[in-house]
Amino acid sequence: MRHFLNALSFAVVLLPATLCAAQIQGKVIRVLDGDTIEVLQEQQPVRVRLLNIDAPEKKQPFGRWSTNQLKALLAGQSVTVSYTQTDRYGRVLGRVITANGTEANRQQVLKGAAWVYDRYNTDNSLPALQREAQTQK
């Protein structure tokens, strides 16, 4: 019994971060590039970096195209952002879900508008989506 309680205590401490995720709900008021948006929550803009992906900067090849793909998906839309942390720039690192259930992070990869950020990726299904996008190009 003692071992069971120790194991249970250990498991509770190590619960996945997604179970403790916070949420932001609001309207996308700005798309900065292919992996960064601003969401208006309670009259305050919150900068959000799409988790697990990276996209070209606007001035890099395909940067404007990537930005336009994200604009087409999110501009003016109501979204829910699930997150567990912020980055060193104060941006929320999150999964962005539209009102109809589309996850923007995954869509950007599937369209070929962003790639999996291997160094920080925590979504094991994204590499397969990236391979699928590469075979369709």
Show the residue positions of the predicted features.
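Small beta-barrel nucleic-acid-binding modules, primarily SNase/OB-fold domains
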Residues: 2-10, 18-137
